[in-house]
Regions:
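Conserved beta-strand-loop surface patch within small alpha/beta domains used
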Residues: 1-45, 52-143
Length: 143
C-alpha cells in the first residue's frame, strides 16, 4: 500500500493520506487526490510497502520515483521489527539515508483513520484475502 506525506505550511505539521489505489503483490497503482493545494501543502514523502518481502528500492521504484522528495519502503511487515529503507530523490539521482533521520516514535497498530481501509483495493483478491489484509492492516494479529 502507498501513503503520501504532506507538509502543511500553514499549520507546520505533517499530514498523511492513503490515496485510492489498486495493489497487487508486486505493484501499486494510485492517483494524487488533488485535495492538497500546492500553495499550502508540500508533497514531502511517499511510503510504500513490500509486504513480507525485504525492504529495498526496486528498478520499478527507480523508474517511478522522479519527483524531488523523500521515499520510503517498508518490508517484512509481519516481523516484530519491520525493515525500512529511506532515500532522497532528485532528477533520478538517489541518496539512501538512515531511516531514523526521517521517522521518530511509533504509532500503535490500528491507530489510523477508518477510511484508509476502503482506499486500498486488492487486485485479484477474494473476500477472505481482503479480510486477512484488513486484519493485518489493523494489527489484530499482533503485528
Amino acid at each position: 500500500a502507498l501513503v503520501n506525506v504532506y507538509w502543511d505550511k500553514q499549520d507546520s505539521c505533517f499530514v498523511l493520506e492513503v490515496p485510492e489505489q489498486k495493489v497487487t503483490r508486486t505493484s501499486i497503482s494510485s492517483r494524487i487526490s488533488g485535495k492538497f493545494d500546492s500553495g499550502r501543502f508540500i508533497h514531502y514523502m511517499d511510503i510504500h510497502s513490500h509486504n513480507n518481502m525485504n525492504a529495498f528500492f526496486s528498478r520499478t521504484d527507480d523508474r517511478d520515483e522522479k519527483a524531488a522528495r523523500v521515499y520510503a519502503v517498508v518490508g517484512r511487515i509481519s516481523s516484530f521489527f519491520p525493515e525500512i529503507k529511506v532515500r532522497i530523490a532528485n532528477s533520478r539521482s538517489f541518496v539512501e539515508i538512515d531511516p531514523s533521520v526521517v521517522f521518530e516514535g511509533i504509532v500503535a497498530a490500528g491507530d489510523f483513520p477508518e477510511e484508509w481501509k476502503t482506499a486500498v483495493f486488492l487486485e485479484n483478491s477474494t473476500p477472505d484475502s481482503r479480510q486477512e489484509f484488513l486484519k493485518q492492516l489493523a494489527g489484530s494479529d499482533g503485528i
